[in-house]
């Protein structure tokens, strides 16, 4: 399940592109999530009223939250699998406060991959996609493990 040094390098190379416009990437990830999986929108009181893509694009709060999500994920990815200290509080809040099921983490992972494919086709070939998929799978597995410890069946 672990990634090789080369795979982590591929992940972090493309992540550098994300960080150059983290709020733009985050906004696009959340819009794809909410459009592709409208049930996920119900977990966000702050965004429930946003019905159209235009409303979502115009929302500064959505843009800010997208940046927050990807900043947290970037912090985890940079730990190259040694992310227990970062995962624990995230799992705690997502299990006990936000009640975000693991399935929704799969959905957002798919959206992240799609946004990277769309925005960075030259830097996100098959090897980089495979590495990012493995990194996001590791993240989800560790979130799920923490959820289980917390008694959350999400």
UniProtKB/Swiss-Prot annotation:
O2 binds at residue 65. Pfam families: Globin. Keywords: Cytoplasm, Heme, Iron, Metal-binding, Muscle protein, Oxidoreductase, Oxygen transport, Phosphoprotein, Transport. It is found in: Cytoplasm, Sarcoplasm. Residues 2-148 form the Globin domain. Its main location: cytoplasm. Transmembrane segments: none annotated. It comes from the Eukaryota. The modification Phosphothreonine is found at residue 68. The keyword Oxidoreductase applies. The modification Phosphoserine is found at residue 4. InterPro entries: Globin, Globin-like_sf, Myoglobin. GO terms for biological process: removal of superoxide radicals. Nitrite binds at residue 65. It catalyses: Fe(III)-heme b-[protein] + nitric oxide + H2O = Fe(II)-heme b-[protein] + nitrite + 2 H(+); H2O2 + AH2 = A + 2 H2O. Its EC number is 1.7.-.-, 1.11.1.-. GO terms for cellular component: extracellular exosome; sarcoplasm. Heme b binds at residue 94. Signal peptide: none annotated. GO terms for molecular function: heme binding; metal ion binding; nitrite reductase activity; oxygen binding; oxygen carrier activity; peroxidase activity. Monomeric heme protein which primary function is to store oxygen and facilitate its diffusion within muscle tissues. Reversibly binds oxygen through a pentacoordinated heme iron and enables its timely and efficient release as needed during periods of heightened demand. Depending on the oxidative conditions of tissues and cells, and in addition to its ability to bind oxygen, it also has a nitrite reductase activity whereby it regulates the production of bioactive nitric oxide. Monomeric. Belongs to the globin family. PANTHER family: MYOGLOBIN (PTHR47132:SF1). This is Myoglobin. The lineage of its organism: Eukaryota, Metazoa, Chordata, Craniata, Vertebrata. The gene is MB.
